[in-house]
Each structure stands twice: as C-alpha cells, then as structure tokens.
Amino acid sequence: MDQTEQQNLNPIEIADGIYWLGYSYGSSSLHCNPYLIVEGDEAVLIDGGSRDDFSYVMLKILRTGLKPAQIKRLIYHHYDPDLCGNLLQMEAMINTPELHIISHAENNVFIHYYSRKTPKIDYRSINNEFVFESGRRLAFYGTPFCHAPGSFVTYDTKTKTLFSSDLFGSYDTEWALFTDLNPACEICYANQICPVTGKACPLYPIGQFHQHIMTSNAALIHALDVMEALDIERIAPQHGSILSGKQQVQLALHYLRRLGDVGIDYLASEKML
C-alpha cells in the first residue's frame, strides 16, 4: 500500500489533536480537506465534506477512536456543497441534541437548505470564539467575499493552525498533503514549471484558484491583512495542500499579496465586462 492509499484510509494527525480527513481523487484538480479537532471528550468537525465524501470522512472519524456523538460543533466556513453536502448524514450519525453549527448569518440562510434540524449559530454572537471544556480556544475572523459574503477563517490558538477555508486553496493535479515551497518562491511570479526545480510550480495553481474564486483584489488584500496579524504555524485550507512552518506560510502570504487580477478585477483587466 503506497502513501496515498494510506492517507486515503486513515486520519492523518497534522498537529496536536488535529486530523486531516480528506481523500485524494487521483487526477482531479480539486481536493477537499475536512478537518477534525479532538480535545478531551469533545470534538469539532470543520468543513465536513460533500455527500459522496461522507463514507470516507466518517470512516476516518471512527478510526481516530472518537464516537460520533462526541462531535459538539460543525464549523462551515461558507455554504457550498463541497463543505456542507453531507450534513444530513453527519446529523444522523452524530445524533445528539448537543450538536450545533457555527457559521456566519449570511451562510446560515443557505446552510438551512441542507438541513433545518441542527441549531445554527452566528460566530459573532459567541464573541467570535468557541472554547472547549479544557480551555482550548478556536477564534473566528471574518474574510468577507473570500469568496462568499459570510466567509471566515478559524484559528486554533493551541497549535497556531489556521483553517483558511478557500483561502490558500489550489487547483492542483499533482496534489500532495503538504506543499513544499522553495525559498526562491519569494521572488518568483509563479510559472507553471519552476525554473529552480524543473517541477510543477506549487504556487501557480494557488494563484489560478484565487483569481477565479475570490471576488476582487480588495477582498483578498483585506483577508491577507487579517491573517498576517496572526501568529500562524500552519495553514490548513479546504482545497489543495497544507502549508506547514512559518517560512512556508510567509512565502504563500507574500505571493498572494502581489497576485493581482483577482475576480472582477481580472475581468476588468481583460476588458471582459
């Protein structure tokens, strides 16, 4: 069994109590990354996945040794089906009145159409945070229009892990769980093939994704301002590869800040409006 097969079958602990529950789709250019945070007898599931992903995600949850009823919160960073599509199945397996959904009011309007059962909380109404019984804290920060009006990110203060939703996501046919950016990336404008390694550039598909998915330069720059104020050790995006280590994080932040032509600004620059 190769490494990819191992990753597809088992939860991968990427930081203390944080498990990647995703699945590699082979040649697909869009990989989805649900995450589970386990703290004591409680757990939080982040961006739980699509309907078709449910069996893989739940198998990995069970293989952590967790009982589904220990999941107390479902965090959805926006309302797309690749995040929320398996909500009905999750509710059936978790099956506890203690379960609540945390998102933004703008998102909850649409999440309601997946299921009306579970109470939905606007993260702003709980002081922008969720605190486990142990004291471990998840902090929420708004990143509006990256890409939905109610988009936000989640920061685990214990491990300094940022769950960035679509930010730092990627269209990537040569996917790996962790990306590996070269220090030379700091001065590179991201070609499809890296001039240093001769391999596919890991930044190029990140740039393509942001130019197509985010709404505007202004929205992306605001989100970067929010994130650069945090002490981040790793970034766990909802698509693409995980960035681990401060150098990797800073290289990616630096690249996105000088990207340009994002969303509506791309169409304007190409005179396509």
What are the language-model segments listed below?
Residues T4-T64, V153-D156, K160-S164:
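Conserved beta-strand hairpin/beta-sheet module of binuclear metal-dependent hydrolase folds
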Residues D231-L273:
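Binuclear metal-ion centers of metallo-dependent hydrolases, dominated by the metallo-beta-lactamase
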Residues S50-R51, P81, G169, I242:
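Short, glycine/acidic-enriched loop or turn micro-motifs at the edges of active sites
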Residues W20-G26, H77-Y79, L138-P144, Q211-T215:
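Short, flexible loop segments at the rims of nucleotide/cofactor-binding pockets, characterized by
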Residues V44-D47, R73-Y76, A139-F140:
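Short catalytic-loop micro-motif centered on adjacent basic/acidic residues
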Residues E13, T96-P237, S241-K246:
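Metallo-beta-lactamase
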Residues D53-I101:
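Active-site metal-binding motif and surrounding structural segment of the metallo-beta-lactamase
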